[in-house]
């Protein structure tokens, strides 16, 4: 940083919290205000006090029974024009406050451990992360869905509202991208716990971690850049209003300001853990630390603290202690450090650290370019006579080293970090250092000798230590801080001349008027353009088409190829023929117990030959007595489990298709509907695995399954169920191309959100409106665009 550049200086110090300040967030009202949360169990609202260049505590809120860990602002609404404050705590709860209420308006319960991160989206959506390894999506006072996939605490969450995307960062070292409740992508690269996330744009975000690194990512998965500078855990990251530059805070007692991809300024604080930060609209930086004090830093001369306040801050900083094990000072041997006279030499760059010996003490100083002086940043503890065994490892670029030397190559130029472990070869380390930094190889011997000289005591038979820089020869050495899925053919593999067709893609029950599921062209009447006859759908859509002769013919043909111990007997085949005839002829006669037992036996045939039996089941399950027999509380779990196993993506497409159609037909009976609702999590999660294929009939069956679930959820107003179904619909819409499947998904969506403002808000927050807009211009079939426009009117 050049002397002409503006730099941040203290604006004010705010005292009020009694313990660590763990979270900060800017708020729109009052203008320029922010909210803080603390281990003292309180939440405080601070508003600017312009005449005094400070802030006034406007409001103190309580509601948690344990430490408060995180905070975010829920944007304004008609009911709450100034927005709401959401806080998460160690009591596993999320408290929601208005800006003028000392107690919560309501409390969100559901997490099983500390809530450590919060982020808000559009329409009142809230995303929370917890030590229980999950993230949860909330709408108003209800949990809409739970995001499961991380294997350790979810330390960071962010919402990208424009695309309906969500990000979670975890102690499992990964970041995950979620769409409509499903994990779309996992970002790997960090070598330790991910602690913070920040959004740069609709396509890029930042992450920081315990590995002391910051990474810039594209949402498509690429890591664009890695930034190093901190020497210990990075706890928080916040972006400037320009959405390019950012600030970070860490366990190394520092706030670091990053501009144009480089660390432009380092500000030391008189506290060990700098837990949190936020950037105000005017560019000022607010920082919370383990000493319970909130500090504001500014570039503005008008908002800079008085000379007395800055002097008091520097005095407080000078009295701080720096643990050589956890600071960024590398290996320290007090006996070999220069004395106070070393401070007469000016530094070469902003934030440069220098250690000096003052009697028995070791003091750390930081160079200020703008002031042209060394500022004391603390006394180093654990350094007198220290060697590397007692002073610990140094963290650099996410790895631990015995030493990390800072080397200035040219006067006033950048410094380079040279990491080294005592088990390394000095010459190989020197060679790698020169190669990495594109430096002249003629310095190889000098660098290697520098390493050897400055690691005395760790290598036998080596010379005395020296603090000379191998490039300048001066006293420049500063001990420094450092799946594919199965692709199915587009055409149904079971169709063709004279071949048995297991069901049809476009069969459904009727609605009032002409059924849009039949594809009847009369559906394009003028009335349909003004009246919504598409949704809400009131009854389940089923797959009814049957050709008993072909089904039985294929059953007998495949049975003849089965192993003897797996074959159906002639009597078995006769019983199956009777039940099929009974079903197809709409007989008032009920299937016998024996017939139902044989049907169960038939659907348990080997997977290579079972699909004709599944087709009989698909037709039979609509019969009340068959539905009750297979779907009752006693038998239902085993029945559904068997069919779910057939949905294996590596299984036979015919079995997948007919199992899905059977599930769709189960909804016509009371027992079947109850079973489908009780098994929805397992069924939906397995069914969605089939979305990646290109078999249009499977896509239509998936869409129909979603539609039938939406019919049930519309009846009982189950908001969590609606959230699951919205996730299913959104996920299928991402890949489906067949317009009949698309139409059924649109009807399902319309049914879910009809007469339910919460469901409308959730759909909007998931970005479903932007997902379906393209269908509003479909010309054929017209039912697709007409249905889409009705939905967009609701959204």
From Swiss-Prot:
Q: Which Pfam families match?
A: PFU, PUL, WD40
Q: What turns on this gene? A: Up-regulated by tumor necrosis factor alpha (TNF-alpha) (at protein level).
A GO-annotated cellular component: extracellular exosome
InterPro entries attached to this UniProt entry: ARM-like, ARM-type_fold, PFU, PFU_sf, PUL_dom, WD40/YVTN_repeat-like_dom_sf, WD40_repeat_dom_sf, WD40_rpt
Q: In this protein, which residues make up the domain named PUL? A: 533-794
State whether keyword Nucleotide-binding applies.
Answer: no
Q: Which GO terms describe its molecular function?
A: phospholipase A2 activator activity; ubiquitin binding
In the record for this protein, the WD repeats are positioned at 17-56, 63-107, 110-148, 149-188, 190-227, 229-268, 270-307
What keywords tag this UniProt record? Acetylation, Cytoplasm, Developmental protein, Disease variant, Intellectual disability, Neurogenesis, Nucleus, Phosphoprotein, Repeat, Synapse, WD repeat
The PFU domain is annotated at 366-465
Localisation: Nucleus; Cytoplasm; Synapse
Domain of life, per UniProt, equals: Eukaryota
Phosphoserine-modified residues are 50
Q: Where are the ARM repeats?
A: 546-588, 589-620, 621-669, 670-715, 716-755, 756-795
A GO BP term, please? positive regulation of dendrite extension
Sites of the modification N6-acetyllysine? 529
**How does this polypeptide assemble, per the annotation?**
Interacts with ubiquitin. Interacts with UBXN6, VCP and YOD1; may form a complex involved in macroautophagy.
Question: Tied to what disorder?
Answer: Neurodevelopmental disorder with progressive microcephaly, spasticity, and brain anomalies: An autosomal recessive neurodevelopmental disorder characterized by progressive microcephaly, spastic quadriparesis, global developmental delay, profound intellectual disability and severely impaired or absent motor function. More variable features include seizures and optic atrophy.
Function per UniProt: Plays a role in protein ubiquitination, sorting and degradation through its association with VCP. Involved in ubiquitin-mediated membrane proteins trafficking to late endosomes in an ESCRT-dependent manner, and hence plays a role in synaptic vesicle recycling. May play a role in macroautophagy, regulating for instance the clearance of damaged lysosomes. Plays a role in cerebellar Purkinje cell development.
Please give the record's comment on domains.
Answer: The PUL domain is composed of 6 armadillo-like repeats and mediates the interaction with VCP C-terminus.
Identify its protein family. Belongs to the WD repeat PLAP family.
Give the protein name, as stated in the record: Phospholipase A-2-activating protein
* Originating species: Homo sapiens (Human)
Q: State the encoding gene.
A: PLAA
């Amino acid at each position: 940083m050049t002397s002409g550049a503006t730099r941040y200086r203290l604006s004010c110090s705010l005292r009020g919290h009694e313990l660590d300040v763990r979270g900060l967030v800017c708020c729109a009202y009052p203008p320029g205000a922010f909210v803080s949360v603390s281990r003292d169990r309180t939440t405080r609202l601070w508003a600017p006090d312009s005449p005094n260049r400070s802030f006034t505590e406007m409001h103190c809120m309580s509601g948690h029974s344990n430490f408060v860990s995180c905070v975010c602002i829920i944007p304004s609404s008609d009911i709450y024009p100034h927005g709401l404050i959401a806080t998460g705590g160690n009591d596993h709860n999320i408290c929601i406050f208005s800006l003028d209420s000392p107690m919560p308006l309501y409390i969100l319960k559901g997490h099983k451990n500390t809530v450590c991160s919060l982020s808000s989206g559009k329409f009142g959506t809230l995303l929370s992360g917890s030590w229980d390894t999950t993230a949860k999506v909330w709408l108003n006072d209800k949990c809409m869905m739970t995001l499961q996939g991380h294997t350790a605490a979810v330390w960071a969450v962010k919402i990208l509202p424009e695309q309906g995307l969500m990000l979670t960062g975890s102690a499992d070292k990964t970041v995950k991208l979620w769409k409509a409740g499903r994990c779309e992508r996992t970002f790997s690269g960090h070598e330790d716990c991910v602690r913070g996330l920040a959004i740069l744009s609709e396509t890029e975000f930042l992450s920081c971690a315990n590995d002391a690194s910051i990474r810039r990512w594209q949402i498509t998965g690429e890591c664009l850049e890695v930034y190093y500078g901190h020497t210990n855990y990075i706890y928080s990251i916040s972006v400037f209003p320009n959405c390019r530059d950012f600030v970070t805070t860490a366990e190394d007692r520092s706030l670091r300001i990053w501009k144009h991809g480089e660390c432009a300024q380092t500000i030391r604080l008189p506290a060990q853990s700098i837990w949190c930060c936020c950037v105000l609209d005017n560019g000022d930086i607010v920082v919370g630390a383990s000493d319970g004090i909130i500090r504001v830093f500014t570039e503005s001369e008008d908002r800079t603290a008085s000379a007395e306040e800055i002097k008091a801050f520097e005095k407080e900083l000078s009295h701080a202690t720096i643990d050589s094990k956890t600071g960024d000072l590398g290996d320290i041997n007090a006996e070999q450090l220069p004395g106070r006279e070393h401070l007469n030499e000016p530094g070469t760059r902003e934030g440069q650290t220098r250690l000096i010996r003052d009697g028995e003490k070791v003091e750390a100083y930081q160079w200020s370019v703008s002031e042209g002086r060394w500022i004391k940043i603390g006394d180093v503890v654990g350094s007198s006579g220290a060697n590397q065994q007692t002073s610990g490892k140094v963290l650099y670029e996410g790895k631990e080293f015995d030493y990390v030397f800072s080397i200035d190559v040219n006067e006033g130029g950048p410094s380079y970090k040279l990491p080294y472990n005592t088990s390394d070869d000095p010459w190989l380390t020197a060679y790698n250092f020169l190669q990495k930094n594109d430096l002249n190889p003629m310095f190889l011997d000098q660098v290697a000798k520098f390493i050897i000289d400055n690691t005395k005591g760790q290598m036998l038979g080596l010379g005395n230590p020296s603090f000379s820089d191998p490039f300048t020869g001066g006293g420049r050495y500063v001990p420094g801080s450092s799946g594919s899925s199965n692709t199915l053919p587009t055409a149904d593999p079971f169709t063709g001349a004279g071949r048995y067709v297991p069901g049809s893609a476009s069969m459904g029950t009727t609605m009032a008027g002409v059924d849009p599921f039949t594809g009847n062209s009369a559906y394009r009447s003028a009335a349909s353009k003004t009246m919504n006859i598409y949704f809400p759908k009131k009854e389940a859509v089923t797959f009814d088409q049957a050709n008993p002769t072909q089904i039985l013919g294929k059953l007998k043909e495949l049975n003849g190829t089965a192993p003897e111990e797996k074959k159906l007997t002639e009597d078995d085949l006769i019983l199956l023929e009777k039940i099929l005839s009974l079903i197809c002829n709409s007989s008032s006669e009920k299937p016998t117990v024996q017939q139902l037992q044989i049907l169960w036996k038939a659907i348990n045939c080997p997977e290579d030959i079972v699909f004709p039996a599944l087709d009989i089941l698909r037709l039979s399950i609509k019969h009340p007595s068959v539905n009750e027999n297979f779907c009752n509380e006693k038998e239902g779990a085993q029945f559904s489990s068997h069919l779910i196993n057939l949905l294996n993506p590596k299984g036979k497409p015919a079995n997948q298709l007919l199992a899905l159609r059977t599930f769709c037909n189960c909804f016509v009976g009371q027992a079947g509907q109850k079973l489908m609702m009780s098994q929805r999590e397992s069924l939906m999660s397995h069914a969605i695995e089939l979305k990646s294929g290109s078999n249009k009939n499977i896509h239509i069956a998936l869409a129909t399954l979603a539609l039938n679930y939406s019919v049930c959820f519309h009846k009982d107003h189950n908001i969590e169920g609606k959230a699951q179904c919205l996730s299913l619909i959104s996920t299928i819409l991402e890949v489906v191309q067949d317009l009949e499947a698309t139409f059924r998904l649109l009807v399902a969506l319309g049914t879910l959100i009809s007469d339910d403002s919460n469901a409308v808000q959730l759909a909007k927050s998931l970005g479903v409106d932007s997902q379906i807009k393209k269908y509003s211009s479909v010309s054929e079939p017209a039912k697709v665009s007409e249905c889409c426009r009705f939905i967009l009117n609701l959204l």
